[in-house]
Regions:
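Fungal secretory targeting signals
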Residues: 1-19
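Generic secretory/membrane-interface signal
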Residues: 2-3, 11, 34, 39, ...
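Generic short N-terminal amphipathic or hydrophobic helices
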Residues: 11-14, 87-88, 323-326
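GH16 jelly-roll
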Residues: 18-292, 340-344, 357-361
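Fungal extracellular Ser/Thr-rich, low-complexity intrinsically disordered regions
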Residues: 281-297, 301-306, 311-361
Length: 361
């Protein structure tokens, strides 16, 4: 129901403003796909008021109007880390003169041990005929084309007697994203108390599979495309968010994503305290899952960083293994094109001077 977005609030045309008291983070793929299987080995963040997520998203969903909204979610709502929320979002977002026409189908699922106490393998399978969510290889939800249920309008939550979300997801390609932030709706995520900060989401590895009906691995319909173990940061594969949006109490900051000891780390901190100084949790079971896999497309050792608009900065350290690596995106060639956020709400309802929204990534 409460959507992530891909926007930056600007104080002056092409200059980013970080006006909120907290910093979150988002990591997303440069590539998008039409169908596939997506897995990530993660220990999620938790704490009342937080959202720790993995999701698929069509990059232009926020435009609204006649641009379809296409999204599939796994979200840990910090008030209850023993459950996760699955969701499909389709329909059309609001735009000038048009209402919010998005449709959601949220469901809750148990996780044991709790998502912030242990690593789990989270997965999403997206095909023309179904969408499935998995935890540690077990299917916990499968939504089949023509059999969708529990659909509601996002604006007002009115029940829909019919929805064709699986078919509608096929209108656009999606990229894979991870983010950590805090929503202002306490009823959804829990009451906020910043004494919990900092909190972290740890990503051991990510696997992306192509949809290849009848030609996949081990007789499946999915063929492994690449595995990233985050021993280094692949700027040709990943970019970092640098934006905020209505209802979010944090600024999404590129300064709050790190790699350390073969782990990607997404942080939620107080503003000005963007850092990771703790110990990386161990995940021997997850390490074993990829220890025998080919390194052909594993991490960035074979990547070409100059092909990406992101730059990779490493703290000076006598030990590459122990170095924490903050990764920053360059804000280049920004184009200001509107005054609404990804949810379609105006970010500047009082028409203050020099307040615009950047729709570039």
């Amino acid at each position: 129901m409460h959507l992530k977005t891909t926007l930056s609030v600007l104080a002056i045309a092409a200059v980013a403003t970080m006006a909120k008291d907290y910093s979150g983070a988002e990591l997303y793929t440069n590539e998008t796909w039409m169908y596939g299987k997506f897995e990530a080995r993660m220990q999620m963040a938790a704490g009342s008021g937080t959202v720790s997520s993995m999701f698929l998203y069509h990059n232009d969903s926020y435009l609204g109007g006649n641009e379809p909204w296409v999204e599939v979610d796994i979200e840990i709502l910090g008030k209850n880390p023993s459950k996760f929320q699955s969701n499909i979002i389709t329909g059309y977002g609001p735009s000038d003169g048009q209402p919010n026409r998005k449709i959601t189908s949220e469901k809750l699922h148990d996780i044991a041990p709790a998502s912030n106490q242990s690593f789990h393998t989270y997965g999403m399978e997206w095909t023309p005929n179904y969408v499935a969510w998995t935890i540690d290889g077990q299917v916990v939800r499968k939504t089949v084309k023509g059999q969708e249920s529990g659909c509601k309008t996002e604006d007002g939550g009115h029940q829909q007697s019919y929805c064709n979300q699986v078919e509608d997801l096929g209108k656009k390609k999606q990229g894979l994203r991870f983010n950590l932030w805090s929503h202002e709706d306490a009823g959804w995520v829990g009451a906020w108390n910043d004494n919990i900060l900092p909190v972290y989401q740890f990503i051991n590895w990510v696997k992306v599979y192509e949809y290849k009906p009848g030609e996949g691995d081990n007789g499946s319909d999915f063929k492994l495309l690449w595995t990233d173990d985050f021993k280094t940061f692949d700027t040709s594969r990943w970019s970092l968010g640098d934006w905020t949006f209505d209802g979010n109490r944090v600024d999404i900051s590129p300064n709050n994503v790190y790699t350390k000891d073969g782990m990607a780390i997404i942080a939620l901190t107080k503003k000005g305290q963007e850092s990771f100084t703790g110990q990386v949790p161990q995940d021997p079971e997850g390490d074993a899952m990829i220890s025998g896999s080919s390194q052909q497309s594993s991490s960035s050792e074979q990547s070409n960083p100059t092909s990406s608009s992101s730059e990779f900065n490493q703290f000076s350290s006598s030990s590459t293994t122990d170095a924490i690596r903050p990764i920053r995106t360059q804000m280049l060639n920004k184009e200001v094109r509107g005054k609404v956020n990804a949810k379609g709400a105006r970010v500047n309802p009082n028409n203050k001077a020099n307040y615009q929204v950047d729709f570039n990534f």
